[in-house]
């Protein structure tokens, strides 16, 4: 198993990030749903149980176009989708991913904590001693780290917010100076139980499936600040319902077009 803790310093308050993250997820879901792949929202409802109290979501992520054509052609449909279950008890969140094709041989879980500060909390997720020994800490810089796919409109080094006047984040040491400031801590467990492939696949999952996705998503999150700033949680729930209906319609249209 490969365990990494990603830390992202952001020029936001913890309260602002709650709205920003939910808005970003809804918008990114719509952007990624096209041509036979995308996201289907199964559940989005409150929960109150042993995991805490918050919002529970269940999604299916379709990957057909993310794989080489030959792989998509030979793999069963169960290998082309990922199931996501998330418990958002903000500021703590937990997300679990599974793939029906691999069953228990593929494990991916993400625990998140959101706190004020510049990434200085050494055990934000309250890990035990054994986990701390295995954990690799990786700071993600949303301005200076380069994603695999560059989008000019989502570049914090050149973006300036009209509503908040935050940005551009063009100082190499912006994380030491920016106000307001918070950190998103994400503890990621990745395990692929296939002898001979384990280390390589776990590294790919962490580097491409998690780190690059987090980097791109949070670059966009900051650059979309003028879209979400001032929204309430009620506004977000309405956007989520509209997104759920829109995604369902897109997926049905895609299925019909691919028949």
Swiss-Prot record:
Gene3D superfamilies: 3.30.530.20. The lineage of its organism: Eukaryota, Amoebozoa, Evosea, Eumycetozoa, Dictyostelia. Keywords: Coiled coil, Cytoplasm, Golgi apparatus, Lipid-binding, Transport. Belongs to the PtdIns transfer protein family. PI transfer class IIA subfamily. One of its GO terms (cellular component) is Golgi apparatus. Residues 231-259 form a coiled coil. CDD domains: SRPBCC_PITP. It comes from the Eukaryota. This is Phosphatidylinositol transfer protein 2. Its main location: cytoplasm. Catalyzes the transfer of PtdIns and phosphatidylcholine between membranes. Pfam families: IP_trans (PF02121).
